[in-house]
Amino acid sequence: MGYDKLEQNLIDIIKEEQAKLGFFTEDIRLYYPLSSLNHFFSAQDNTDEMQIRLDSLPDSITEKLGQIHVSHKGDRFCFHIPKEGTVYVHDNTAPNEFIHNLVELVGKHGCTMNEILNLFHTYSQNVITKKMDNGEFDLLIRFADKPEDTYYYCFKDEGCHIIYHRFLPDDYTDFNF
């Protein structure tokens, strides 16, 4: 189960990167804190235990994403995904239309929070919003009824543009926003 969650998250992040930057046949590096990896596996591994867990990824992942090299410095883990992995995601998975549209919208000059909320509502009428006053973000939006998208999307209006970051539910809870 944990490896399935890890695989899906790696693919989700690669899709998001491709929506933001375009598709390139190149290696990429994705970084995770130990706490996020422990959430995937419902574990409380220390860094050495997690490194051992990740040193031999299952064939179900490597057959798709290639021979991923995992290393860490402190509690920050780096997943070095070979170009075969980015090509696989591009060629063999459906694009995430919502992420593509969100990236396009927030990249537009003059984008508003209302436009972002309207975009969410085009994908579901069951959307949860929460105003945030933590200095980091202004608004949380998430889908209440989309098991394929459990992310918490946090937005910050920086005056001239809006930025966002998406968190897995457990990671969002860890931040204690």
What are these regions (language model features)?
Residues 112-155:
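A cross-family detector of function-defining hotspots
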Residues 28, 38-69:
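Charge-enriched amphipathic alpha-helical scaffolds
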Residues 147-177:
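Intrinsically disordered, low-complexity regulatory segments enriched in Ser/Thr/Pro
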Residues 60-92, 162:
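Charged low-complexity interaction tracts in eukaryotic proteins
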Residues 23-44, 96-106:
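Short glycine-rich, basic-tinged beta-strand/loop micro-motifs
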